[in-house]
């Protein structure tokens, strides 16, 4: 009987720890095989882009990120929570819509980013340039390294 109780307690403790861990690690949507996507959580070199390393307050970096996105004429934040954000970027000429996904990871002082075209195959590097331009703006604001 004691063995069953100990086993049950151990099982519940491990199960609770796994649930808490999986809930704290949010994931960006994966990139498709086409080259029109970049993600800081991608496992392959053609899609991978460095995440943003926060050098101060995560809240300050998060607020600055939202401020920068809101200042862009063709970017609209469509959904946000305390630690996730989705925005849409519309191209000037053809009105193509790209998705921007962002996750704030306070545990590692990191902002994970993804930018992907909804249609087509190639984006001529637009998504990578967008994420790097955003990085530069956040670096100028001294909220990321």
Regions found by a protein language model. Name each.
Residues 15-145:
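Ser/Thr-rich, low-complexity intrinsically disordered terminal regions
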Residues 1-9:
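Sec-dependent signal peptide recognition
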């Amino acid at each position: 009987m004691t063995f069953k109780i100990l086993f049950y307690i151990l099982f519940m403790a491990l199960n609770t720890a796994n649930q808490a861990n999986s809930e704290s690690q949010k994931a960006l949507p994966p990139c498709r095989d086409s080259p029109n996507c970049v993600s800081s959580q991608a496992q392959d070199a053609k899609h991978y882009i460095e995440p943003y390393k926060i050098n101060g307050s995560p809240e300050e970096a998060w607020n600055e990120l939202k401020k920068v996105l809101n200042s862009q004429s063709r970017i609209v934040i469509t959904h946000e929570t305390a630690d996730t954000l989705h925005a849409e970027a519309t191209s000037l000429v053809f009105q193509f819509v790209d998705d921007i996904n962002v996750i704030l990871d306070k545990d590692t002082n990191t902002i994970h980013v993804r930018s992907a075209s909804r249609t087509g195959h190639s984006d001529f590097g637009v998504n990578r340039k967008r994420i790097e331009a955003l990085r530069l703006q956040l670096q100028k604001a001294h909220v990321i390294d």
